[in-house]
Each structure stands twice: as C-alpha cells, then as structure tokens.
C-alpha cells in the first residue's frame, strides 16, 4: 500500500506521515507540502478554496510526481482538484483531515470510484467551548461592558439585567444533540444547570444517560 500525505503551513507532511504509520503500520509514504509564498497567500488561497472549491487553489506540482501509483491520499487544506484526481489512477481513498471537504473535488472522485472521507468532530471541542463562552459573555455582558469601558464609561445596568445573572440553576435549551451538543451538555454540568434537549433524531435513552 502506498499513501501520499500532503501537508500545509498548519499541518506538516511529517506529522501526517507519523499519524499514518501509527494507524496503518509500516506502509510506504510519500510526502509533499503545500508552501505558498507567504502566510498571506496561504490564507487567501485557503479562503478562495472555501468559497469556490478546489479549482481555486494552487496545489504543489510535486503531487504529480507521486500520485500516479498511490492508493490513498491524505490532505488537510491542500486543494485536490479534478486534475489531481484524474491522475490518481490507482487511488481508492482520499482523506481530508478536517471537518469539511471543500478542498476536494468530490464529484470527480466519485466518478472515478474514489471514496472521500472527512474528519467529523475534529473541531467539536473548539465549537462547544466557544458556545459556552458566548453564553457567559451574554449573561455577564462581557462584550458590552468591554465596549463601554473602552469609551471611558462604567455602565451598571444593561437591557437584559432583568433575566441574566449567575448560570446557577438556569434552564438551558439545546437544539440538536449530536457530538457537539453532547459536549456542550457535558461541559455545562459544572455550572449546575438544567438542560433541555430537542432533537428529533436523538435517542431518548441516550439523552437521559447524558444527564
């Protein structure tokens, strides 16, 4: 089995190779790194790919030195466009080490019989942390107070003063109880709140077991 790992400024090919060998054992690994001329160019191209798809990026030409006899391609943010997919005659799997597959030409891969996988839940902890952070910021008017202080004002009353305060014993409703919803509920337990869940696809026993 031959695996091509394609790194970028956020996740190097060395780290991808180490992960592949940890999971698959002693397989043959080829490494390529996407190295735009500057950080600014990388973030610009990444944004273009997010909005317009893999054809908007500029993947490294070194990919074509290896892709012809590769079984698996592992990428992070590097665009895998139709040209790369077409050249990957033996490839059967493309794995994206991210939550989405915006940087992979899924239609071209499907046409060629290549399965495309992404990393579900990769950013779930970050999203759940941020969700709780927003709850605290809203209840404690952190953002509003910061803005007032920057203007030299010490404001004591806010429009939501009548119904905010401590998190303690608040009722919190979660719409959706997938992986992120589970994490939010788990992290909220330390605040001693009552959690209400709505998710037509969730198993009632699973919700109860989560507390």
Tell where the protein language model's regions lie, with residue ranges:
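Alpha-helical segments flanking ligand/cofactor-binding loops in enzyme cores
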Residues: 64-65, 107, 186
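Short, polar loop motifs at secondary-structure junctions
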Residues: 10, 78-79, 199-204
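Short, hydrophobic beta-strand segments that form beta-sheet elements in well-ordered domains
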Residues: 3-6, 31, 73-75, 94, ...
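Phosphate/diphosphate ligand-binding glycine-rich loop within oxidoreductases
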Residues: 7, 69-150, 164
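Short gly/ser/thr-rich secondary-structure transition/capping motifs
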Residues: 52-58, 75-76, 151-158, 209-211
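N-terminal glycine-/charge-rich "phosphate-binding" loop or analogous flexible N-terminal tail
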Residues: 1-70
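Rossmann-like dinucleotide/phosphate-binding beta-alpha-beta segment
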Residues: 142, 160-211
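Acidic, amphipathic alpha-helical patches
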Residues: 60-63, 81-84, 160-163, 210-211
